[in-house]
């Protein structure tokens, strides 16, 4: 499945979902991409690299959701003894997406340091572009909502 969680999260954001609950299972993408000279002594061990990539993936997912106006939390929802995949991303819509230079800069620094380009970021950037183009093409929609 690889990036299925990213597509589901992007759809939820695109639909302006008020609450998003996601138990991500797909974190392989960054495992193939992640590179960092400082972390190389750790990343050379496949198991550790895989686990770090999974945590970084979910951390970035939460950051993208915050950038889009959600208050995001990452929680354990079941004991580790039952399954190692027990992370829940809970996001509640708090505001409209806006340019938050701190969140955006933080995301970009992390991506650059680890040399990763997550699918969710590209998908959400695509939605933002489509939304901006739609508003330009259909300004009457904005006028009706303002009445």
Which functions belong to the PLM regions below?
Residues 1-147:
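Class I S-adenosyl-L-methionine
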């Amino acid at each position: 499945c690889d990036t299925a969680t990213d597509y589901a999260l992007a759809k939820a954001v695109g639909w302006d979902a008020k609450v998003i609950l996601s138990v991500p299972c797909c974190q392989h993408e960054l495992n193939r991409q992640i590179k960092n000279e400082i972390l190389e002594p750790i990343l050379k061990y496949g198991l550790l690299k895989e686990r770090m990539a999974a945590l970084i993936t979910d951390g970035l997912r939460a950051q993208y959701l915050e950038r889009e106006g959600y208050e995001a939390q990452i929680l354990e929802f079941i004991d580790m003894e039952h399954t190692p995949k027990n992370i829940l991303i809970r996001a509640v819509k708090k505001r409209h997406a806006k340019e938050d230079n701190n969140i955006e800069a933080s995301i970009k620094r992390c991506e650059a340091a680890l040399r990763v380009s997550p699918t969710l970021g590209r998908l959400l950037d695509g939605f933002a572009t489509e939304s901006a183009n739609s508003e330009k093409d259909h300004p009457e929609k904005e006028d009706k909502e303002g009445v």
